[in-house]
Amino acid sequence: MRDVFICDAVRTPIGRFGGSLAKVRADDLAAAPIKALMAKHPNLDWAQVDEVFFGCANQAGEDNRNVARMALLLAGLPDSVPGQTLNRLCASGLDAVGAAGRAIRSGEIELAIAGGVESMTRAPFVMGKAQEAFSRSAEIFDTTIGWRFINPLLKAQYGVDAMPETGENVAEEFQVSRADQDAFAIRSQQRAGAAIAAGYFAEEITPITIPGGKAGPITVDKDEHPRPETTLEGLAKLKPIVRNPGTVTAGNASGVNDGAAAMILASEAAVKKHGLTPRARILGLASAGVPPRIMGIGPVPATRKLMERLGKKISDFDLIELNEAFASQGIACMRQLGVADDADYVNPHGGAIALGHPLGMSGARLALTAVHGMEKRGGKLALATMCVGVGQGVAVAIEKLN
Protein backbone atom coordinates (compact mmCIF):
# COMPACT_ATOMS: atom_id res chain seq x y z
CA MET A 1 0.00 0.00 0.00
CA ARG A 2 1.28 3.44 -0.90
CA ASP A 3 1.89 6.44 1.33
CA VAL A 4 -0.54 9.37 1.32
CA PHE A 5 0.97 12.78 2.03
CA ILE A 6 -0.67 16.01 3.15
CA CYS A 7 1.32 18.68 1.31
CA ASP A 8 -0.56 21.84 2.23
CA ALA A 9 -3.84 22.92 3.81
CA VAL A 10 -5.78 26.13 4.40
CA ARG A 11 -9.16 27.17 5.72
CA THR A 12 -11.40 30.18 5.81
CA PRO A 13 -12.16 31.96 9.05
CA ILE A 14 -15.15 30.38 10.79
CA GLY A 15 -18.08 32.76 10.68
CA ARG A 16 -20.70 33.18 13.35
CA PHE A 17 -24.29 32.31 12.38
CA GLY A 18 -25.56 35.38 10.54
CA GLY A 19 -22.09 36.92 10.82
CA SER A 20 -19.52 38.24 8.38
CA LEU A 21 -19.73 35.25 6.01
CA ALA A 22 -23.53 35.31 5.86
CA LYS A 23 -23.55 36.85 2.37
CA VAL A 24 -21.11 34.29 0.93
CA ARG A 25 -22.73 31.45 -1.00
CA ALA A 26 -21.68 27.94 0.01
CA ASP A 27 -20.18 27.19 -3.41
CA ASP A 28 -18.17 30.43 -3.34
CA LEU A 29 -17.10 29.65 0.23
CA ALA A 30 -15.89 26.20 -0.86
CA ALA A 31 -13.97 27.74 -3.75
CA ALA A 32 -12.05 30.12 -1.45
CA PRO A 33 -9.57 27.64 0.11
CA ILE A 34 -9.05 25.95 -3.27
CA LYS A 35 -8.16 29.33 -4.77
CA ALA A 36 -5.80 29.97 -1.87
CA LEU A 37 -3.98 26.68 -2.47
CA MET A 38 -3.67 27.52 -6.16
CA ALA A 39 -2.19 30.91 -5.31
CA LYS A 40 0.31 29.33 -2.90
CA HIS A 41 1.47 26.85 -5.55
CA PRO A 42 1.54 28.81 -8.83
CA ASN A 43 3.92 26.39 -10.54
CA LEU A 44 1.83 23.29 -9.94
CA ASP A 45 0.08 21.97 -13.04
CA TRP A 46 -3.45 22.01 -11.65
CA ALA A 47 -4.77 20.08 -14.64
CA GLN A 48 -2.97 17.10 -13.09
CA VAL A 49 -5.34 17.00 -10.10
CA ASP A 50 -7.11 13.67 -10.43
CA GLU A 51 -10.12 14.48 -8.24
CA VAL A 52 -11.55 17.01 -5.81
CA PHE A 53 -13.29 15.46 -2.80
CA PHE A 54 -15.42 17.80 -0.69
CA GLY A 55 -17.65 17.10 2.28
CA CYS A 56 -20.94 18.92 2.85
CA ALA A 57 -23.71 17.96 5.25
CA ASN A 58 -26.69 19.95 4.01
CA GLN A 59 -26.83 20.10 0.20
CA ALA A 60 -30.37 21.48 0.27
CA GLY A 61 -29.54 25.00 -0.92
CA GLU A 62 -26.68 26.69 -2.77
CA ASP A 63 -24.56 23.65 -1.92
CA ASN A 64 -26.79 21.45 -4.10
CA ARG A 65 -25.87 19.51 -7.26
CA ASN A 66 -22.37 18.48 -6.24
CA VAL A 67 -20.81 21.49 -4.54
CA ALA A 68 -17.33 19.97 -5.00
CA ARG A 69 -17.66 20.30 -8.76
CA MET A 70 -19.18 23.78 -8.51
CA ALA A 71 -16.40 24.93 -6.20
CA LEU A 72 -13.52 23.66 -8.29
CA LEU A 73 -14.92 25.41 -11.37
CA LEU A 74 -15.48 28.64 -9.43
CA ALA A 75 -11.93 28.40 -8.09
CA GLY A 76 -10.53 28.28 -11.61
CA LEU A 77 -9.42 24.67 -11.84
CA PRO A 78 -9.61 23.26 -15.39
CA ASP A 79 -12.97 21.77 -16.30
CA SER A 80 -11.17 18.48 -16.97
CA VAL A 81 -10.76 18.04 -13.18
CA PRO A 82 -13.63 15.99 -11.70
CA GLY A 83 -15.16 16.51 -8.29
CA GLN A 84 -17.38 14.58 -5.90
CA THR A 85 -19.28 15.61 -2.79
CA LEU A 86 -19.43 13.31 0.22
CA ASN A 87 -21.98 13.36 3.03
CA ARG A 88 -21.44 11.72 6.39
CA LEU A 89 -23.11 14.67 8.15
CA CYS A 90 -20.66 16.16 10.70
CA ALA A 91 -17.77 13.98 9.49
CA SER A 92 -18.22 14.82 5.80
CA GLY A 93 -14.99 16.83 5.59
CA LEU A 94 -12.99 14.17 7.42
CA ASP A 95 -14.52 11.53 5.17
CA ALA A 96 -13.45 13.55 2.12
CA VAL A 97 -9.86 13.49 3.38
CA GLY A 98 -10.17 9.75 4.03
CA ALA A 99 -11.72 9.03 0.62
CA ALA A 100 -8.98 10.93 -1.18
CA GLY A 101 -6.38 9.12 0.91
CA ARG A 102 -7.84 5.71 0.11
CA ALA A 103 -7.91 6.48 -3.62
CA ILE A 104 -4.25 7.49 -3.54
CA ARG A 105 -3.26 4.54 -1.36
CA SER A 106 -4.96 2.10 -3.73
CA GLY A 107 -3.12 3.52 -6.75
CA GLU A 108 -6.23 4.80 -8.51
CA ILE A 109 -5.11 8.44 -8.34
CA GLU A 110 -1.93 10.39 -7.59
CA LEU A 111 -2.99 13.95 -6.71
CA ALA A 112 -6.15 15.23 -5.03
CA ILE A 113 -7.73 18.15 -3.24
CA ALA A 114 -9.85 17.24 -0.23
CA GLY A 115 -11.87 19.42 2.11
CA GLY A 116 -15.28 20.46 3.28
CA VAL A 117 -17.74 23.33 3.41
CA GLU A 118 -20.87 24.41 5.24
CA SER A 119 -22.86 27.62 5.24
CA MET A 120 -25.33 27.02 8.03
CA THR A 121 -26.46 30.63 7.87
CA ARG A 122 -27.66 30.17 4.29
CA ALA A 123 -29.32 26.78 4.82
CA PRO A 124 -32.81 27.05 3.30
CA PHE A 125 -36.25 26.06 4.47
CA VAL A 126 -37.64 23.09 2.52
CA MET A 127 -41.09 21.66 2.00
CA GLY A 128 -42.08 18.31 0.54
CA LYS A 129 -44.66 17.85 -2.16
CA ALA A 130 -48.26 17.08 -1.23
CA GLN A 131 -49.01 13.37 -0.88
CA GLU A 132 -52.62 13.76 -1.98
CA ALA A 133 -54.78 16.28 -3.79
CA PHE A 134 -55.74 19.40 -1.84
CA SER A 135 -53.56 18.33 1.10
CA ARG A 136 -53.22 20.81 3.94
CA SER A 137 -50.59 18.83 5.83
CA ALA A 138 -47.44 20.23 4.24
CA GLU A 139 -44.49 20.55 6.63
CA ILE A 140 -41.70 23.09 6.38
CA PHE A 141 -38.26 22.13 7.70
CA ASP A 142 -35.35 24.39 8.61
CA THR A 143 -32.35 22.57 7.12
CA THR A 144 -29.76 24.34 9.29
CA ILE A 145 -29.40 21.28 11.51
CA GLY A 146 -31.27 18.16 12.51
CA TRP A 147 -33.93 15.85 11.15
CA ARG A 148 -36.19 16.45 8.16
CA PHE A 149 -38.59 14.23 6.18
CA ILE A 150 -38.44 11.63 8.95
CA ASN A 151 -39.07 8.00 8.07
CA PRO A 152 -41.75 6.74 10.51
CA LEU A 153 -40.21 3.24 10.57
CA LEU A 154 -36.84 4.64 11.62
CA LYS A 155 -38.55 6.83 14.21
CA ALA A 156 -40.35 3.81 15.67
CA GLN A 157 -37.11 1.82 15.88
CA TYR A 158 -34.61 4.42 17.06
CA GLY A 159 -36.43 7.63 17.88
CA VAL A 160 -35.46 10.97 16.42
CA ASP A 161 -33.64 12.70 19.25
CA ALA A 162 -32.52 16.23 18.38
CA MET A 163 -28.78 16.82 18.62
CA PRO A 164 -28.96 18.53 22.06
CA GLU A 165 -31.07 15.61 23.30
CA THR A 166 -28.32 13.20 22.27
CA GLY A 167 -25.93 15.35 24.30
CA GLU A 168 -28.22 14.95 27.31
CA ASN A 169 -28.45 11.20 26.69
CA VAL A 170 -24.66 10.89 26.72
CA ALA A 171 -24.40 13.03 29.86
CA GLU A 172 -26.91 10.79 31.63
CA GLU A 173 -25.56 7.44 30.44
CA PHE A 174 -21.91 8.29 31.10
CA GLN A 175 -22.52 10.43 34.20
CA VAL A 176 -21.08 13.72 33.00
CA SER A 177 -22.15 16.56 35.30
CA ARG A 178 -23.17 20.09 34.33
CA ALA A 179 -20.19 21.45 36.27
CA ASP A 180 -17.76 19.26 34.34
CA GLN A 181 -19.35 20.28 31.04
CA ASP A 182 -19.09 23.98 31.85
CA ALA A 183 -15.46 23.58 32.94
CA PHE A 184 -14.71 21.83 29.64
CA ALA A 185 -16.38 24.66 27.73
CA ILE A 186 -14.37 27.30 29.59
CA ARG A 187 -11.12 25.53 28.72
CA SER A 188 -12.12 25.50 25.05
CA GLN A 189 -12.86 29.23 25.10
CA GLN A 190 -9.72 30.14 27.01
CA ARG A 191 -7.46 28.06 24.79
CA ALA A 192 -9.00 29.46 21.61
CA GLY A 193 -8.76 33.00 22.95
CA ALA A 194 -5.09 32.57 23.80
CA ALA A 195 -4.37 31.07 20.37
CA ILE A 196 -6.12 33.91 18.54
CA ALA A 197 -4.36 36.55 20.65
CA ALA A 198 -1.03 34.94 19.76
CA GLY A 199 -1.87 34.85 16.04
CA TYR A 200 -1.71 31.06 16.11
CA PHE A 201 -4.35 30.44 13.44
CA ALA A 202 -3.01 33.02 10.98
CA GLU A 203 -1.05 30.37 9.07
CA GLU A 204 -4.16 28.21 8.71
CA ILE A 205 -6.53 30.92 7.56
CA THR A 206 -6.98 32.43 4.12
CA PRO A 207 -8.79 35.79 4.50
CA ILE A 208 -12.16 36.28 2.81
CA THR A 209 -12.97 39.63 1.21
CA ILE A 210 -16.66 40.45 1.11
CA PRO A 211 -18.08 43.26 -1.03
CA GLY A 212 -19.44 46.02 1.17
CA GLY A 213 -21.75 48.97 0.76
CA LYS A 214 -20.62 52.56 1.06
CA ALA A 215 -17.85 51.52 3.43
CA GLY A 216 -16.30 49.30 0.76
CA PRO A 217 -15.21 45.67 0.95
CA ILE A 218 -14.67 43.91 4.27
CA THR A 219 -11.85 41.45 4.90
CA VAL A 220 -12.53 38.66 7.39
CA ASP A 221 -9.34 37.03 8.68
CA LYS A 222 -10.23 35.78 12.17
CA ASP A 223 -12.68 33.26 13.59
CA GLU A 224 -15.81 35.02 14.85
CA HIS A 225 -17.33 32.47 17.20
CA PRO A 226 -14.92 32.39 20.19
CA ARG A 227 -15.95 34.15 23.40
CA PRO A 228 -12.77 34.10 25.51
CA GLU A 229 -14.37 36.43 28.04
CA THR A 230 -16.80 33.66 29.03
CA THR A 231 -16.85 32.85 32.75
CA LEU A 232 -18.04 29.87 34.75
CA GLU A 233 -20.50 32.16 36.50
CA GLY A 234 -21.92 33.21 33.16
CA LEU A 235 -22.21 29.64 31.92
CA ALA A 236 -23.94 28.58 35.13
CA LYS A 237 -26.74 31.08 34.45
CA LEU A 238 -27.62 29.56 31.06
CA LYS A 239 -30.76 27.46 30.90
CA PRO A 240 -30.65 23.91 29.49
CA ILE A 241 -31.74 23.69 25.86
CA VAL A 242 -34.02 20.63 25.84
CA ARG A 243 -34.54 19.35 29.39
CA ASN A 244 -35.36 20.83 32.74
CA PRO A 245 -33.49 19.78 34.73
CA GLY A 246 -30.80 19.27 32.12
CA THR A 247 -27.12 19.90 31.52
CA VAL A 248 -26.65 20.84 27.85
CA THR A 249 -26.72 24.60 27.23
CA ALA A 250 -25.79 26.97 24.44
CA GLY A 251 -22.58 27.62 26.35
CA ASN A 252 -21.32 24.03 26.51
CA ALA A 253 -22.36 23.03 22.99
CA SER A 254 -20.76 23.73 19.63
CA GLY A 255 -21.83 26.63 17.47
CA VAL A 256 -23.84 26.93 14.26
CA ASN A 257 -21.36 28.33 11.77
CA ASP A 258 -20.02 28.94 8.27
CA GLY A 259 -16.64 27.93 6.84
CA ALA A 260 -14.57 25.87 4.40
CA ALA A 261 -11.21 24.10 4.34
CA ALA A 262 -9.11 22.33 1.71
CA MET A 263 -5.84 20.42 1.48
CA ILE A 264 -3.54 18.93 -1.16
CA LEU A 265 -3.02 15.17 -0.88
CA ALA A 266 -0.43 13.37 -2.99
CA SER A 267 1.31 10.07 -3.54
CA GLU A 268 5.09 9.85 -3.30
CA ALA A 269 5.30 9.89 -7.09
CA ALA A 270 3.14 13.04 -7.29
CA VAL A 271 5.22 14.74 -4.59
CA LYS A 272 8.36 14.22 -6.67
CA LYS A 273 6.72 15.03 -10.00
CA HIS A 274 5.22 18.33 -8.85
CA GLY A 275 7.94 19.46 -6.45
CA LEU A 276 5.65 19.39 -3.43
CA THR A 277 6.83 19.37 0.17
CA PRO A 278 4.98 16.78 2.26
CA ARG A 279 4.05 17.95 5.76
CA ALA A 280 2.39 14.83 7.11
CA ARG A 281 1.29 11.32 6.25
CA ILE A 282 -2.21 9.88 6.65
CA LEU A 283 -1.87 6.51 8.36
CA GLY A 284 -5.50 5.44 8.21
CA LEU A 285 -9.19 6.12 8.80
CA ALA A 286 -11.81 4.11 10.65
CA SER A 287 -15.54 4.55 11.17
CA ALA A 288 -18.00 2.89 13.53
CA GLY A 289 -21.69 2.89 14.33
CA VAL A 290 -23.38 3.48 17.70
CA PRO A 291 -27.02 3.88 18.82
CA PRO A 292 -28.34 7.14 17.30
CA ARG A 293 -29.60 8.37 20.69
CA ILE A 294 -25.98 8.47 21.98
CA MET A 295 -24.34 9.43 18.71
CA GLY A 296 -21.81 11.55 20.63
CA ILE A 297 -19.91 8.48 21.85
CA GLY A 298 -19.10 7.50 18.24
CA PRO A 299 -15.42 8.56 18.38
CA VAL A 300 -14.70 5.84 20.96
CA PRO A 301 -15.35 2.73 18.84
CA ALA A 302 -13.98 4.46 15.73
CA THR A 303 -10.74 5.33 17.53
CA ARG A 304 -10.45 1.85 19.04
CA LYS A 305 -10.93 0.28 15.62
CA LEU A 306 -8.27 2.57 14.14
CA MET A 307 -5.82 1.89 16.96
CA GLU A 308 -6.26 -1.86 16.61
CA ARG A 309 -5.66 -1.66 12.87
CA LEU A 310 -2.50 0.45 13.29
CA GLY A 311 -1.20 -1.31 16.38
CA LYS A 312 -1.39 1.90 18.43
CA LYS A 313 -2.68 2.82 21.86
CA ILE A 314 -4.16 6.13 22.97
CA SER A 315 -0.96 7.14 24.77
CA ASP A 316 0.90 6.99 21.43
CA PHE A 317 -0.88 10.14 20.23
CA ASP A 318 0.93 13.39 20.97
CA LEU A 319 -2.06 15.48 19.86
CA ILE A 320 -5.78 14.79 19.70
CA GLU A 321 -8.24 16.98 17.82
CA LEU A 322 -11.66 15.88 19.08
CA ASN A 323 -14.68 17.66 17.67
CA GLU A 324 -16.58 19.23 20.55
CA ALA A 325 -20.16 18.73 19.40
CA PHE A 326 -21.13 18.93 23.06
CA ALA A 327 -18.99 19.10 26.18
CA SER A 328 -20.88 16.07 27.49
CA GLN A 329 -19.83 13.85 24.61
CA GLY A 330 -16.31 15.24 24.48
CA ILE A 331 -15.76 14.37 28.14
CA ALA A 332 -17.46 10.98 27.82
CA CYS A 333 -15.27 10.04 24.86
CA MET A 334 -12.08 11.14 26.61
CA ARG A 335 -12.94 9.19 29.75
CA GLN A 336 -13.82 6.06 27.77
CA LEU A 337 -10.48 6.30 25.96
CA GLY A 338 -8.55 6.87 29.20
CA VAL A 339 -7.77 10.55 28.68
CA ALA A 340 -8.10 13.18 31.43
CA ASP A 341 -10.84 15.82 31.06
CA ASP A 342 -8.27 18.63 31.05
CA ALA A 343 -5.51 16.93 29.02
CA ASP A 344 -3.44 19.71 27.46
CA TYR A 345 -2.82 17.75 24.26
CA VAL A 346 -6.53 17.44 23.45
CA ASN A 347 -7.75 20.49 21.53
CA PRO A 348 -4.85 22.58 22.89
CA HIS A 349 -6.02 25.64 20.96
CA GLY A 350 -9.73 25.24 21.56
CA GLY A 351 -12.37 23.16 19.84
CA ALA A 352 -15.79 23.49 18.29
CA ILE A 353 -17.40 24.93 21.42
CA ALA A 354 -15.19 27.98 21.00
CA LEU A 355 -14.22 27.94 17.33
CA GLY A 356 -17.55 26.76 15.94
CA HIS A 357 -18.80 23.75 13.99
CA PRO A 358 -19.61 24.33 10.30
CA LEU A 359 -20.74 20.75 9.79
CA GLY A 360 -19.18 19.71 6.48
CA MET A 361 -16.04 21.75 7.06
CA SER A 362 -15.21 20.66 10.60
CA GLY A 363 -13.58 17.32 9.84
CA ALA A 364 -11.22 18.85 7.30
CA ARG A 365 -10.40 21.57 9.83
CA LEU A 366 -9.56 18.97 12.46
CA ALA A 367 -7.09 17.29 10.10
CA LEU A 368 -5.58 20.64 9.10
CA THR A 369 -5.30 21.83 12.70
CA ALA A 370 -3.74 18.52 13.73
CA VAL A 371 -0.96 18.93 11.15
CA HIS A 372 -0.42 22.56 12.12
CA GLY A 373 -0.48 21.65 15.80
CA MET A 374 2.23 19.02 15.51
CA GLU A 375 4.42 21.43 13.57
CA LYS A 376 4.01 24.13 16.21
CA ARG A 377 3.93 22.05 19.41
CA GLY A 378 6.09 19.14 18.43
CA GLY A 379 5.04 15.52 18.49
CA LYS A 380 4.87 12.84 15.83
CA LEU A 381 1.39 11.36 15.87
CA ALA A 382 -2.06 12.98 15.91
CA LEU A 383 -5.62 11.74 16.08
CA ALA A 384 -8.56 13.61 14.53
CA THR A 385 -11.93 12.21 15.53
CA MET A 386 -15.57 13.22 15.67
CA CYS A 387 -19.09 12.02 16.32
CA VAL A 388 -21.76 11.92 13.63
CA GLY A 389 -25.52 12.39 13.72
CA VAL A 390 -27.67 9.23 13.44
CA GLY A 391 -25.01 7.38 15.41
CA GLN A 392 -21.52 7.13 13.93
CA GLY A 393 -17.93 8.05 14.68
CA VAL A 394 -14.91 8.65 12.43
CA ALA A 395 -11.22 8.74 13.34
CA VAL A 396 -8.09 9.53 11.31
CA ALA A 397 -4.44 9.06 12.34
CA ILE A 398 -1.86 11.51 10.96
CA GLU A 399 1.92 11.31 11.26
CA LYS A 400 4.13 14.40 11.06
CA LEU A 401 7.16 14.23 8.79
CA ASN A 402 10.65 15.55 9.56
Which residue stretches match the model-derived regions?
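N-terminal extracellular/periplasmic Venus flytrap/periplasmic-binding protein-like
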Residues: 11-12, 22-23, 27-31, 43, ...
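Conserved catalytic cysteine-centered active-site region
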Residues: 24, 56-112, 144-147, 157-163, ...
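Active-site-proximal alpha-helical scaffold in enzymes
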Residues: 87-118, 171-200, 262-269, 334-335, ...
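Flexible glycine-/small-residue-enriched beta->alpha junction loops
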Residues: 105, 111-169
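Active-site pocket-lining segment
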Residues: 168, 204, 212, 283-354
